[in-house]
Amino acid sequence: SSAASDVYKRQVLKGGSKSYVEKIIEGFQEKIFLSRPVIKVERSPSEVKIYCDKEPDPILFDKVIFATHSDQALELLEDPSDDEKSVLEALPYQKNTAIVHTDVSLMPKIKKTWSSWNYLLSGDLNRPVTLTYNMNILQSLDAKPDFLVTLNSLNEISPSKIIKKVEYSHPLFTVRGIHAQKKKSQISGHKNTYYCGAYWGNGFHEDGVNSALDVCKAFGVSL
């Protein structure tokens, strides 16, 4: 049900992904505004207007960078171009229910094949693959029992071993989407607008960071 004997060795951050987010925002934390949702973005050749919920006047900027999901960016744009519609619509997100639990029956029967990501196939081609992350491996947890996160599970998990359920949205990769990824230059950098997010790569945190670095390069900045 999962990886073979040649399990990849991964490097992980102590404290999980939260630790690198804290490091990245160290220099500008006071410029991050929470509980101030953006509801609309209007663009002109000379400026960008950002409208926030319950605020009558827009905030003016020279440029806008969308560090959001592709569908969220498209929804916020007041006047998306045909290229923006075509590319962003081809890179959709889908909702997944993530279940945090301790039921190791979702893991491979042979323990030495346990890996960070483990797939379970039902044989039903109309049913999505069940994916289980082993958090003990991913976050170097020295803990008992094994803490797992499973996506797209249909009743395989023992109810007594469920800790929490969370709704997430993840990139949905298709052949059309792979072609759309190659057209990023047609929309990012146009109309004073730039796009970054994990959907430009394979959906990993690293892909999100790499796409952000691409935007930095567009501004002549290297990190």
Positions of predicted regions on the chain:
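Short, small-residue-biased leader/transition segments that mark boundaries at the very start
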Residues: 1-8
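Mid-domain catalytic core of redox enzymes
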Residues: 36-171
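A conserved beta-strand/loop element that lines the FAD pocket in flavoprotein oxidoreductases
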Residues: 27-38
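Short active-site alpha-helical segment characteristic of glycosyltransferases
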Residues: 20
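A structural signal for the hydrophobic beta-strands that form the central parallel beta-sheet
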Residues: 32-34, 66, 195
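Conserved flavin/dinucleotide-binding core of flavoenzymes
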Residues: 127-223
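Short, well-ordered alpha-helix to beta-strand connector turns
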Residues: 4, 28-29, 61-62, 190-191
